[in-house]
Amino acid sequence: MSGGLSVLGLKDDDVRRFLTAKTHIGTAQLDFQMQQYCFKRRSDGVYLIDLKKTWEKLLLAARAIVAIENPAEVCAISSRPYGQRAVLKFASFTGATPIAGRFTPGTFTNQIQAAFREPRLLVVCDPREDHQPVTEASYVNIPVIAFCNTDACLRYVDVAIPCNNKAQHSIGLMWWMLTREVLRMRGSIIREIPWDTMVDLFFYRDPEEAEKEEQTQVVPERSIKEAPEFPPDQWGVGDTAAVQPEVADWSTAAEIPFQSAPAPAPAPAPATDDWASTGTATVGPTTEWGAATDNSWAS
């Protein structure tokens, strides 16, 4: 398919990316419809995928996506966690409609529900995991593009892109390459200039690891203004002396009127007379506690 034009040929950089992400490594099972896309079988029983056919099918899928006038009518689906971030990035760059996560049954067939949609093209991450949207697409005649491994069933799949769809780096790389080819065919980016978007943006990231990376980020310390240095003979001068508050004269401060407390009453003088003595008093008739009077009742 791409053999006629050298511009559309598979470049060495793309082959290096395929090999690094292990896109060519399949599974130990082989479906009879995927046999045409396999290159050979290793000694351990794992089938290897022909990367040239992978590239040709990738270009065919990009042409089918570009042929849709309204980009929102292209639906990208991934129920696997490894492909959800790549699907969202693909939709943000191409304008497609993403469905990341669980697919609601009846989205393409049940017109009563609020999530009903009528896309013109469907792109799925794995026909095994996303069997529900693929089956519903066959009911309403929606063409399906799928990333297929060696054990995938091609029933109801119109364009199969052979690749390793079980590795997180491989599936992220395939979505990145599909996005790049769509933008190139639309004329959004130039084919001769490398795309400035890194492929790492399409890779899956564990939420726990992302939180740990955010927590381990070093917070930049605030710059502290250094105080000016003075020689020993000038200690005490400078900003420190200027900041000292002015001391007021407490003797000249205004007196606050206040009410003085009343003086305490003088204590009574102690008694000087002897209680036991029977002497004569100087002030009046002497009376003792035990003395009898003239009209004494005891006489």
From Swiss-Prot:
Pfam families in UniProt: 40S_SA_C, Ribosomal_S2
UniProt biased composition (Polar residues): 275-285
Keyword Transcription attached: no
GO cellular component terms attached to this protein's record: cytosolic small ribosomal subunit
First and last residue of the signal peptide: none
UniProt-recorded Gene Ontology molecular function terms: structural constituent of ribosome
Chief location bin: cytoplasm
One of the protein's GO biological processes: translation
Keyword Ribonucleoprotein: yes
Subcellular location: Cytoplasm
Chain spans, region Disordered: 210-299
UniProt feature coiled coil, ranges: none
Keyword list, A-Z: Cytoplasm, Ribonucleoprotein, Ribosomal protein
Subunit and interaction comment: Component of the small ribosomal subunit. Mature ribosomes consist of a small (40S) and a large (60S) subunit. The 40S subunit contains about 33 different proteins and 1 molecule of RNA (18S). The 60S subunit contains about 49 different proteins and 3 molecules of RNA (28S, 5.8S and 5S). Interacts with ribosomal protein S21.
Biological role stated in the UniProt entry: Required for the assembly and/or stability of the 40S ribosomal subunit. Required for the processing of the 20S rRNA-precursor to mature 18S rRNA in a late step of the maturation of 40S ribosomal subunits.
Family: Belongs to the universal ribosomal protein uS2 family.
PANTHER family: 40S RIBOSOMAL PROTEIN SA
Protein name, UniProt field: Small ribosomal subunit protein uS2
